[in-house]
């Protein structure tokens, strides 16, 4: 595919690998990735949260088929999770999740639904560096 250049390339796999301890239960890395995806889809693709929920099983299937088998080839793996992002993403999603509770449960997103409303509202924008990867999702 790369015309022999693969020997000169360095593979890097970047994704959320962390989980969040919610005091008795855990938000998984997949649930955290859903939060990122839902906020980004709403902000940059004009897609409502329910559209992202409907696509989520297909997205996860694509990861399983086309990403997971190859990520072990990466020379470096980077966990892109930021400790403060859950609070920000959950605040942005909070008003819409209860409306889609049944669909979220059906998509395996119970943890995201359970986390709704558990985070304090904060004025976060002044504290996020301009170069932060979080801007890819929140704008």
Where are the regions a protein language model picked out?
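Conserved NTP phosphate-binding and transfer environment spanning the P-loop NTPase/kinase superfamily
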Residues: 1-139
């Amino acid at each position: 595919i790369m015309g022999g250049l693969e020997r000169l390339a360095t593979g890097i796999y970047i994704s959320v690998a962390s989980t969040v301890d919610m005091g008795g239960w855990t938000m998984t890395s997949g649930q955290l990735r859903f939060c990122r995806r839902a906020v980004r889809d709403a902000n940059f693709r004009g897609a409502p949260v329910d559209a992202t929920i409907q696509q989520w099983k297909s997205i996860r299937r694509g990861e399983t088929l086309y990403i997971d088998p190859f990520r072990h080839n990466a020379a470096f793996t980077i966990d892109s999770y930021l400790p403060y992002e859950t609070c920000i993403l959950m605040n942005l999603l909070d008003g819409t999740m209860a409306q889609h509770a049944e669909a979220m449960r059906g998509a395996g997103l119970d943890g995201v639904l359970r986390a709704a409303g558990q985070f304090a509202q904060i004025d976060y924008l002044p504290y996020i560096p301009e170069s932060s990867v979080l801007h890819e999702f929140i704008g």
